[in-house]
Amino acid sequence: MLIHPQFDPAAIRIGSFAIHWYGLMYLMAFVQFLLLGRLRIRAPRYQALGWTYKYLEDLLFAGVLGVVLGGRLGYTLFYMPGFYLANPLGIFKIWEGGMSFHGGLLGVLAALYWFAKKRKTTFFVVSDLVAPLVPFGLAFGRLGNFINGELWGRPTDLPWAMAFPLVDSVPRHPSQIYQLLGEGVLLGIALWFYAGKSRRVGQVSGFFLLGYGICRFLAEYAREPDAFLGLLGLGLSMGQWLCVPMIFFGIYLMTTFKSKSK
């Protein structure tokens, strides 16, 4: 059995000043968005629209707002609505933790819609640009989860099981690593190559929704359900139920918009 190293939450300390690992992972996610985004805007579709690096910066700013606001509101609505109805001011205490990927996704979609309107283009043109950049950013986020020793997995006796001393001494799935590799690295590589070929507007976005939904749905079988929710209908977690519409909508987009040259 492996033991989680219990990293210092701060990656860098200078006197009373500290840069935490999770903040550093967010920074890395933003940097990779801009670096890979430079490559994405070279595609003929975006060159024809006159996309520039400044567009990427504006898009990143809008996306960050969407992630933070949507992620927090999604967590309060999907996971702990009763608690936050009784303690509404707690919604604003982001530093205490509590973010939802699915809520963050809805926030980003709203930001992309606003950005598309501002730039007088279509929503899926923007979302197709962004989709291949998201998984690698998620990988950094899951690495931050692992370093912090949070979002651990269910008990297991597999050889690579890991105990997380912050919770107990039970050997568990290192589910953060599963998600890092699945919805982060593997999905990112597959989506990058898929988006590199001629696709109809909307198909790349559909591939992301389908791919993420499947990866997250499967990873949830290894991840410990939230203690305050447990498992819901059909023995599925909240995360799995939220992935179901993603999967079906992803299939819809990929099959509705048939392949067409850019």
Curated annotation (Swiss-Prot):
It is a multi-pass membrane protein. Keywords: Cell inner membrane, Cell membrane, Membrane, Transferase, Transmembrane, Transmembrane helix. It comes from the Bacteria. GO terms for molecular function: phosphatidylglycerol-prolipoprotein diacylglyceryl transferase activity. Belongs to the Lgt family. Catalyzes the transfer of the diacylglyceryl group from phosphatidylglycerol to the sulfhydryl group of the N-terminal cysteine of a prolipoprotein, the first step in the formation of mature lipoproteins. This is Phosphatidylglycerol--prolipoprotein diacylglyceryl transferase.
